[in-house]
Amino acid sequence: MAEAPLTRIERLALRFAEATNVDPRGKWLQTRFLRGISYLWVRAGLANRMLVEGLDGIMALRPETGVMLVSNHRSFFDQYAMLLACYMGPVHWSKRLFFPVRSNFFYDQPLGIVVNAVVAGGAMYPPIFRQAERRALNDAALDKMVELLQTPGNVLGMHPEGTRGKGPDPYEFLPAQPGVGKVALLGKPIVVPAFIHGLGNNIVQDIAWNLGSEARKSRAVITVFGPPVDYDDLMAEKPRPALYKKAADRFMLEVGKLRAREKELRAQVNSGELTDDDPRWLDNRPVGKLYAREGKP
C-alpha cells in the first residue's frame, strides 16, 4: 500500500512540532511557556480541588533514563492534571514534557495546531497516525518516543487505552493497546502509573467548578501515583507483538490497582475526614503561584 502524502496543514503542523520539540532552543522556549503561562491557567482552573497522593514518592525517584507516566483516560485534560502535579511537587526529573497524541485534529486541522500551540506550547508531540496507509509515519513516531526516553529529564505522558473511556463507569477501563508496551520495552524507561478521576471535558465548566465554595467536597479531582512498575522480566524476553500487549496490560493492571485508594480518598473527602489543610491538596504545597520552578533532587 502506497504511503499517503501529508497534506499542507499536516506538514505545517509537523514543522511547528519539530521546531518546539526537536530543536533544543525550541524545547527550552516551550518549557518556559509551560512553566510560566500554561501553569498559571491550569493552576487557576484546577489546583484548588486537586488532591494528589503518592507525589512525594515519585519526587524521591532518581531516574537515570526518561520516565513514562501512564494513566487511565477519561478527560481531554488528564495530562494537564499530571503536568500540574509534576510542576507543583515540584518533581525534579520532569524537565521536558511530551504528550503523544493522535494526529486527528491536532495535526490535520488549523484549529488543532492553534490549540497545541496556545494551550501546550506544542508539547502534544509526537503525533500518532493510525491510518493503515500512514504506518511508516506511525513507526517513526514510535521510534521518536523510544529515542526521547533515552534521555534523563524527558517525561512522556501516555494513555495505554489509546482513547478516552466514554462509558458511564469512570472506574472501568478500555483494553490496553500494544503501542505503549512497545515503546516501554524498547525505550526501557521508568514507568510510573497514575489513576485520575474527577475531571470533566468542558474546560469552562471545570474552571467554574474549581472556583465554587464546595469544589473540593463535590468536585474533587483525585490523582493517585503508584510506585514504578516492575517489568524487568518482560525486558529480558525477545521483543514481539504479543509481549508488547503483555507489557501494556501490566501497566494498566498497575493503574487499576490505584482505583481502590482513590475511592477511599474520595470517601474521606466527602465525609470531611480529609480536611482542607491536608498537604495532599495541591494548593497547600509551598510553591510559587506565578511560575513553576524546577525542583531539586
Give the residues covered by each predicted segment.
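Residue-level signal for beta-strand positions within conserved beta-sheet cores that form or flank
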Residues: 48, 93-95, 219-221
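Short, flexible active-site-adjacent loop segments at beta-strand->alpha-helix junctions, enriched
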Residues: 56, 73, 103-105, 162, ...
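Catalytic core of membrane glycerolipid acyltransferases/transacylases, capturing the structured
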Residues: 61-134
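A transmembrane-helix-recognition feature enriched in membrane-embedded lipid enzymes
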Residues: 3-53, 81-84, 88, 92, ...
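Non-catalytic C-terminal accessory region of glycerolipid acyltransferases
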Residues: 2-22, 26, 135-297
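A generic local structural motif
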Residues: 37, 52-57, 86-87, 142-144, ...
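Helix-to-loop junction immediately C-terminal to a conserved catalytic motif
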Residues: 41-73
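Aromatic-acidic/polar surface patches that form glycan- and anion
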Residues: 30, 72-75, 173, 244
